[in-house]
């Protein structure tokens, strides 16, 4: 057990809002800033449950490459707009809901035009959905589900309505997380850490709520190590087929789930690299040509991919 004469660290919410929060924990023994900040960041980005649009039914539309008479946007554009919809379930036990929209032109259709429901709250009612011209009509049924992480359309394949179009879903309500570790002092001691966590969310959960959930998830998993009988349990065998299926699913993960630093993530996204599959399509020469990607960044990418069982092409 770590011997320390420090009093309990003080947790402070220096900034707290619906979409952004900044939290400080200090003082910590040297090294514990990174020890706590890194896993919390990864959990916040990958494991906080949220809601997302999973399928869309549009009257008289058979597939996503259709156009709608009297509607400026095509179906692909409408679906892209709907993917930005932020919905909060007011009942924590609710697993899914269907939002209904009826509109006639001329009109700019926004998220606030969905039929009101006592069970849900639309957090971005000004979100643009479509533009209807004179005589244009639009009827939609949009299914919203609760989930975790990223689920491609072909995996959840929701078809609870004939001609419903499945949609790729990013459930995470956490948009971005950054942490910083600085030196701090207490009395004569100057070898202490100050951890600052900055969290951005979509507003369906507050940054503090997301942080509390991440802490609970981390505690739950650390408790597995405290069970002395756990090591006596037989390790389940995983078939080759299950391994292949798991690897295929990992290919479709968004880059955020690799736990890369914000700087590296930004450099890759600037080049249009959004998924593990897209990253693995590049070789080392390709990556070195990306602005902001040096040898240290390459090593970070290698290690992140190795944790998923992947290696970069030479």
UniProtKB/Swiss-Prot annotation:
Cysteines paired by S-S bonds: none
Record keyword Amino-acid biosynthesis present: no
SMART domains reported for this sequence: RPOLD
Organism superkingdom: Bacteria
Pfam families: RNA_pol_A_bac, RNA_pol_A_CTD, RNA_pol_L
GO MF, one example: DNA-directed RNA polymerase activity
GO biological process, one term: DNA-templated transcription
Keywords: DNA-directed RNA polymerase, Nucleotidyltransferase, Transcription, Transferase
Entry keyword annotation includes Cytoplasm: no
Enzyme class: transferase
EC number(s) reported in the record: 2.7.7.6
Stretches for region Alpha C-terminal domain (alpha-CTD): 246-314
One Gene Ontology cellular component annotation held by this UniProt entry: DNA-directed RNA polymerase complex
Function in brief: DNA-dependent RNA polymerase catalyzes the transcription of DNA into RNA using the four ribonucleoside triphosphates as substrates.
NCBIfam families associated with the record: PRK05182.1-2 (NF003513), PRK05182.2-5 (NF003519), rpoA (TIGR02027)
Annotated family: Belongs to the RNA polymerase alpha chain family.
Assembly mode: Homodimer. The RNAP catalytic core consists of 2 alpha, 1 beta, 1 beta' and 1 omega subunit. When a sigma factor is associated with the core the holoenzyme is formed, which can initiate transcription.
Domain notes: The N-terminal domain is essential for RNAP assembly and basal transcription, whereas the C-terminal domain is involved in interaction with transcriptional regulators and with upstream promoter elements.
Identification of the protein by name: DNA-directed RNA polymerase subunit alpha
Organism field: Thermus aquaticus
Origin organism lineage: Bacteria, Thermotogati, Deinococcota, Deinococci, Thermales
């Amino acid at each position: 057990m770590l011997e320390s004469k420090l009093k309990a660290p003080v947790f402070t919410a220096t900034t707290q809002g619906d979409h952004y929060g900044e939290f400080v924990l200090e003082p910590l023994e040297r090294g514990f800033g990174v020890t706590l900040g890194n896993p919390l960041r990864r959990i916040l980005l990958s494991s906080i449950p949220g809601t997302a649009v999973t399928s869309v039914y549009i009257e008289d539309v058979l597939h996503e490459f259709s156009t709608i008479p009297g509607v400026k946007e095509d179906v692909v554009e409408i679906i892209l707009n709907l993917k930005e919809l932020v919905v909060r379930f007011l009942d924590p036990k609710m697993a899914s809901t269907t939002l209904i929209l009826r509109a006639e032109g001329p009109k700019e259709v926004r998220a606030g035009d969905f039929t009101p429901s006592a069970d849900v709250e639309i957090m971005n009612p000004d979100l643009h959905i479509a533009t209807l011209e004179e005589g244009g009509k639009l009827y939609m049924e949009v299914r919203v589900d609760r989930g975790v992480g990223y689920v491609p359309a072909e995996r959840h394949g929701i078809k609870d309505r004939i001609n419903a179009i499945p949609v790729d879903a990013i459930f995470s309500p956490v948009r971005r997380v950054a942490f910083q570790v600085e030196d701090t002092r207490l009395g004569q001691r100057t070898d202490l850490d100050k951890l600052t966590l900055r969290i951005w969310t979509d507003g369906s959960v507050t940054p503090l709520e997301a942080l509390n959930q991440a802490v609970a998830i981390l505690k739950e998993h650390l408790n597995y190590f405290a069970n002395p009988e756990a090591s006596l349990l037989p390790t389940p065998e995983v078939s080759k087929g299950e391994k292949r299926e798991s690897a295929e699913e990992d290919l479709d993960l968004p880059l955020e789930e690799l736990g890369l630093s914000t700087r590296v993530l930004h450099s890759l996204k600037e080049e249009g690299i959004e998924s593990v599959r897209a990253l693995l399509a590049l070789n080392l020469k390709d990556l070195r040509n990306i602005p902001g990607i040096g040898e240290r960044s390459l090593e970070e990418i290698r290690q992140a991919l190795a944790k998923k069982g992947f290696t970069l092409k030479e």
